[in-house]
């Protein structure tokens, strides 16, 4: 099966969008965003939408819900399936770009998310099981299990069993067959840290504080805004008078650096569990590197 999905992943400020747009332009592609915050309308500077970068390239799963809507990985997977089918049916190539690891894994590992209620009786029964017994129960309930992430943590094991046994008598929704080619952008740590700091300064100069203040004036409490990511959390604290501007910048900058490390850790974990990522050097020519890998995979450039 030839590649039917291109994926560009990497930590924040790594240049994913730019590369994704360049490849989409060359491959008759369209962007599918895998960013948990860019779905929200009105949250532009703080989420780094950079819509001007897209130019004439169509994009999906950006600006689709209002702040306050609880958008989660279940919603993302449904949106991805619709966008993927829409793009493929018109003979174009989906290019998924993002750094939200859970969203990326949901697609690449073909997680089957359904709205399954908690089963109190089943949970009481499973509470007497060892982790090994839970793992065997899950394998019995889902013999086609290929992704083993759910076997690594007890709470996820229980929930996975709950879902598998709930689904057993139901007709599953079809998931698209994927043949992804995955690129990741990486930088030396000091260089990425400087890119993060420079980008934060630029966003503040572009009016990020005003954007967040306007969201508050539109009726969104500061306490709610704090749940929409680091930028919104620390700027909300500044606007409430809990931090001065310098402390806000320093704490936010440090928090974004830590977030980038967590993203890198997530991507490494994906690799340990079998995801093949072709890493491109950010300080080299990632577009040229990507085109060479595309050539080797016999994908027209």
Swiss-Prot record:
Catalytic activity: adenosine(37) in tRNA + dimethylallyl diphosphate = N(6)-dimethylallyladenosine(37) in tRNA + diphosphate
Purpose: Catalyzes the transfer of a dimethylallyl group onto the adenine at position 37 in tRNAs that read codons beginning with uridine, leading to the formation of N6-(dimethylallyl)adenosine (i(6)A).
Keyword Phosphoprotein tagged: no
Any GO molecular function: tRNA dimethylallyltransferase activity
Region: Interaction with substrate tRNA, residue numbers: 35-38
Site positions for Interaction with substrate tRNA: 100
Database matches in NCBIfam families: miaA (TIGR00174)
SUPFAM superfamilies reported for this sequence: P-loop containing nucleoside triphosphate hydrolases
Chain residues that bind ATP: 10-17
HAMAP family the UniProt entry points to: IPP_trans
Coiled coil stretches, renumbered: none
Origin superkingdom: Bacteria
Protein's gene: miaA1
Gene3D superfamilies given in the database record: Crystal structure of tRNA isopentenylpyrophosphate transferase (bh2366) domain, P-loop containing nucleotide triphosphate hydrolases
Signal peptide positions on this chain: none
Protein name: tRNA dimethylallyltransferase 1
Family per record: Belongs to the IPP transferase family.
